[in-house]
């Protein structure tokens, strides 16, 4: 039987909030079977909980943000969510003492490191996968995203940026998802932005934690980071990383194929909602005897071996 997973031990780290620029402490705790992914704002009294759910995503302006009925929010969850998806973590309690998850280095790699330090624990309950039975597509202008049936989890993503630092032959990427492929091929890809946009947002009191330490920063001609890019196609890889985190808001690993062109947080969330609203397009499946078509967290020590 493929079982649900949680953390083996409590893990903690600190970082900077992208939007506030203030120190954030992040703590992840094990949870019981069927608890799901729970975010907590422990800086508030009483503590406010957010359950990972696509209907709770009400702000996708600069990140993916969960907002409750009292307009209390927790922001920038997508990179951590993508790391949870990589290891198939079904149940976890995530605590922050701020309105946002720390941005860390702008990728999912620090969260992967935390999860590896914690270890993964199986729970005595079957893991539920969300399996696509029909193709669902959403579109806005020339941007689109779709999920379709596939025996595994396949992702194909294309971007279309007109910038000297983003070459035409580095704007598409695709791969079959597993913990190992995510760690090796996607987890280190960082978020990116333009120096003029960051300076403008900071003048308005936004993006106060934005810096060269947590993003690829460009001017009109080049990448400004001294160390350059981690991958030649780091931009599209990061957009795919974002999509994995956005889709995992449903709390279940997906069995299907995700394809997208110029999609972002808003369209990713719109697609997930469209799938869930069309109940004939998907089903929950468990694997009692046969192996699941996707590998999650098996032989974690192999994840850094090329």
Swiss-Prot record:
Keyword check for Lipid biosynthesis: yes
Protein keywords: Hydrolase, Lipid A biosynthesis, Lipid biosynthesis, Lipid metabolism, Metal-binding, Zinc
Reaction(s) catalysed (UniProt annotation): a UDP-3-O-[(3R)-3-hydroxyacyl]-N-acetyl-alpha-D-glucosamine + H2O = a UDP-3-O-[(3R)-3-hydroxyacyl]-alpha-D-glucosamine + acetate
Enzyme class label: hydrolase
List of residues binding Zn(2+): 79, 238, 242
GO molecular function, one term: UDP-3-O-acyl-N-acetylglucosamine deacetylase activity
GO cellular component: membrane
Pfam families, per database record: LpxC
Active site: 265 (proton donor)
GO biological process: lipid A biosynthetic process
Enzyme Commission no: 3.5.1.108
Entry cofactors: Zn(2+)
Protein's pathway: Glycolipid biosynthesis; lipid IV(A) biosynthesis; lipid IV(A) from (3R)-3-hydroxytetradecanoyl-[acyl-carrier-protein] and UDP-N-acetyl-alpha-D-glucosamine: step 2/6
Family statement: Belongs to the LpxC family.
Role, per record: Catalyzes the hydrolysis of UDP-3-O-myristoyl-N-acetylglucosamine to form UDP-3-O-myristoylglucosamine and acetate, the committed step in lipid A biosynthesis.
NCBIfam families per the UniProt record, alphabetical: lpxC
Name of the protein: UDP-3-O-acyl-N-acetylglucosamine deacetylase
Native organism: Hamiltonella defensa subsp. Acyrthosiphon pisum (strain 5AT)
């Amino acid at each position: 039987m493929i079982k649900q997973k949680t953390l083996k031990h409590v893990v903690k780290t600190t970082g900077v909030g992208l939007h506030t620029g203030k120190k954030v402490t992040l703590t992840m705790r094990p949870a019981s079977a069927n608890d799901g992914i729970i975010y907590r704002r422990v800086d508030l009294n009483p503590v406010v909980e957010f359950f990972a759910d696509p209907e709770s995503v009400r702000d996708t302006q600069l990140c993916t943000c969960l907002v409750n009925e009292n307009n209390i929010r927790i922001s920038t969850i997508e990179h951590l969510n993508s790391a949870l998806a990589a290891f198939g973590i079904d149940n976890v309690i995530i605590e922050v003492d701020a309105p946002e998850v720390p941005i860390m280095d702008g990728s999912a790699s620090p969260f992967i490191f935390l999860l590896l330090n914690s270890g993964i624990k199986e729970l005595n309950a079957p893991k539920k996968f969300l399996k696509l039975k029909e193709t669902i597509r959403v579109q806005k202008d020339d941007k689109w995203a779709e999920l379709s049936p596939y025996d595994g989890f396949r992702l194909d993503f294309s971007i279309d940026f007109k910038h000297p630092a983003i070459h035409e032959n580095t704007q598409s990427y695709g791969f079959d998802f597993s913990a190992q492929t995510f760690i090796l091929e996607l987890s280190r890809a960082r978020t990116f932005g333009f120096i003029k946009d960051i300076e403008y947002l900071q003048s308005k009191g936004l993006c106060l934690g934005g810096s060269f330490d947590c993003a690829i920063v460009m001017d009109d001609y080049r990448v400004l980071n001294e160390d350059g890019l981690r991958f030649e196609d780091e931009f599209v890889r990061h957009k795919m990383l974002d999509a994995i985190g956005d889709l995992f808001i449903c709390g279940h690993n997906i069995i299907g194929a995700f394809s997208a062109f110029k999609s972002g947080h808003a369209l990713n969330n719109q697609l997930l909602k469209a799938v869930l609203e069309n109940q004939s397009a998907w089903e929950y499946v468990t694997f009692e005897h046969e192996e699941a078509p996707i590998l999650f967290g098996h032989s974690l020590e192999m994840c850094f071996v090329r």
